[in-house]
Amino acid sequence: MSRENVELVRNLSEHFVATGEPAWDMLHEHVEVRDHDIMDGREYRGHADVRRWLFEDWASAWSAYSAEPEEFIDVDDERVISVSRVKATGRSSGAEMERQDAIVYVVRDRQIVRVDYYNSKQQALEAVGLSE
C-alpha cells in the first residue's frame, strides 16, 4: 500500500504544480492541515479551510511562488514525505527566498486525511521519528 500512497502524493504534487489548485478529489472532505511555518499554528479542516490556508493565509505573504517536487519518502503504511524546492518573493519586502520545504501526508483509503507543512526536510523527518 505504501508504494500506492507515494504515487498518490506524487500525483497530487504534480497536479498542484501544473494547475495551481489541489486535486480536491485526492483530499478527504475533512482533511486536516497544519502549517508549522505560520506563527499562529492553527489547524485547518475541510476543503474550504484548506482553500483559505493556501490562497489567503499562506499565499498572502508572497507576490510570487513556485515549488518543484524533488523527493518522495515512503515513511510507513500511512505516511509519505514530499520534499520540494520552493522559491518565493515576499509581498511586502520584495525579498527573494529559496529553500527546501517538506510536507508529511497521511493517507488512508486512497485519500489524504492529514497534511503537516514544514519549512525544512529535517523538520519533517524529525516529526515522523527519522533523521538524515
Regions found by a protein language model. Give the residues of each.
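Short, cysteine-centered beta-strand-loop-beta hairpins and adjacent loop/turn segments enriched
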Residues: 60-63, 88-98
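Intrinsically disordered, low-complexity linkers and terminal regions
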Residues: 33, 79, 97-104, 127, ...
